[in-house]
Amino acid sequence: WAFVLALLPVLSAAQVVDPNADPVRISGALGGTLSGYQMNGINARQQPLGYSLSGTLNISVYGWTLPFSVAISRQGSTFSQPFTRFGVSPEYKWVKLHAGHRNLRFSEFTLNNVTFLGGGVELRPKAFRFSAMYGMLQQAQRADENRYGVAQYKRMGYGALLGLGRKNTFDLTFFRAADDVSSLPLLDTLQRITPQASTTLGLRSRVQFAKDRLVLDADLAVGAYTHDLNAPRLDEDIYADRPIVGELGFNYASNLAGAGAVGLDYVKDKFTSGVQYRMVQPGFRTLGANYLLSDVEQITLRTAFPLAKDKLQLSGQFGVQRNNLSDRRFAGTARNIGSANVAYRPSTRVSVNLNYANFSIYQTLLLDTLFADSVLIDQVNHQVIVATLYQYGDAKRQHSWSLMTGYQQLSDRSDGPTDLGNRLINLNLQYQLRWLASRWGLVLGANYNDYSALLTTNERYGATVGATRMLKKDKLLLRLTHTWNRSQLPDRMDDIHSTHFSMNYRLSDRHALMLSAGNIRREGLQAFTETRGTVGYRMRF
């Protein structure tokens, strides 16, 4: 924050004010909903009453832009207090500041859109880039304060990005986060949780060459992850010649690993083709990402191009993935992933899309010498989806037919007495009719699903009917739908009826009202009736 405050006078001195511009402009939006809920027959899945409030406020002062946002809601049955977040990111020319609950992204392997409560700055003058942040990534919570009954430590983090270039870019990133060991009482630390820390240094680059037909993308990182800050520290003689190890507080629960993704693409007119190599070593982790799969290596080939004067679009990719890079797992897994997509649109009335995907997984036992190289899993999953659309009409009526079909087959080729595979078939047909003068609309639909496996089958079919009407010079939209589905299992049959009504009324250019109500009734085993209703209002200023 000292850096930000020191920067403000410089920015103010460099500011050029347009005397004809409004010195202050304010705009934004405010909305809220109130919902009711009732369940009969089984346990309720949410509270009887709920609410949500959200708002945005944009203030412009002599070119400075200050956007504010806030959200408050109450949902679920185990929250003891409302959920509230607030953040602001004022911006002026190439300067952007952050305060409150914010998200920043440096790279995939350092800081990747994790939410923090704190402050930050982004500077982007011409081809130069600088970003920095500091804040709390998670607050301390005792086990009895958390809806999942699991305690968590207070976690603080900071990071920076330094980059150059526009067409060809080079970014150096750094991020560190650590849990506060003293943020939980001793009783909660007895759970199977440990204070963690991570330090990651990354390099990201994008370079175009060969008359911009070749594009090289690289995202590389090396990081140290400690899964228990309470573990014994390393002896000084171990890192005597590597002082950085001591500065970062490495201990016997620390691990040093790398990660990266490098891709090369060839682009000419509308044809693209490329290859990407990706590897995340075992033990690599950054606390700046919500989720990152480690111990994986993958190579992917991809291509896309049009034919028949752009009426036919073809694309596809094929990849090979494996884990157990250090041969320390009990079993190793390899996957082959392939997909192809064909999109054909001969006219504005007709379109056909075909997608095929093939996923195979192969797992072998590695460490047990008695069963070395024996196959544990050998499965292939085929999936085909075909979607067609046909539209026609005149000045009075518009018709639309859509049909989506899907087929999925899982084949189990593992060593064993039986095939554990399964099959799934989906069919969805929908017809829409619109009367342009009266603003009426009609929707008819039918669906069919058939699932079969070794020990069970499930056949489901149903129909949908709905109507829409536009009133008040298209300011009021009314919609009513009813859906019926029947599910047939070997030992029982269930019927589900679902009715939904909604109204959206645009009172003016700045005000809108929303109302919705729905009812779900299940007949058969575990019969129940569920009713929901919501009213909402939104305004712009």
Regions inferred by a protein language model and the residue ranges of each:
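Outer-membrane beta-barrel translocator/receptor signature
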Residues: Q46-L53, V61-L66, T78-T84, K93-W94, ...
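Outer membrane beta-barrel
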Residues: A71-L137, Y266-S273, M279-G283
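Transmembrane beta-strand segments of Gram-negative outer membrane beta-barrel proteins
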Residues: Q15-G41, Q47-L49, I59-F68, P90-A99, ...
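Glycine-centered structural positions embedded in regular secondary structure
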Residues: V24-L30, G135, G157-G159, D171, ...
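Exposed, low-structure sequence patches enriched in small/polar residues
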Residues: Q46-S54, Q81, L162-L164, N168-R176, ...
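Hydrophobic, small-residue-rich alpha-helical packing segments that form membrane-like cores
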Residues: Q139, A143-A197
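Bacterial N-terminal signal peptides
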Residues: A2-V10
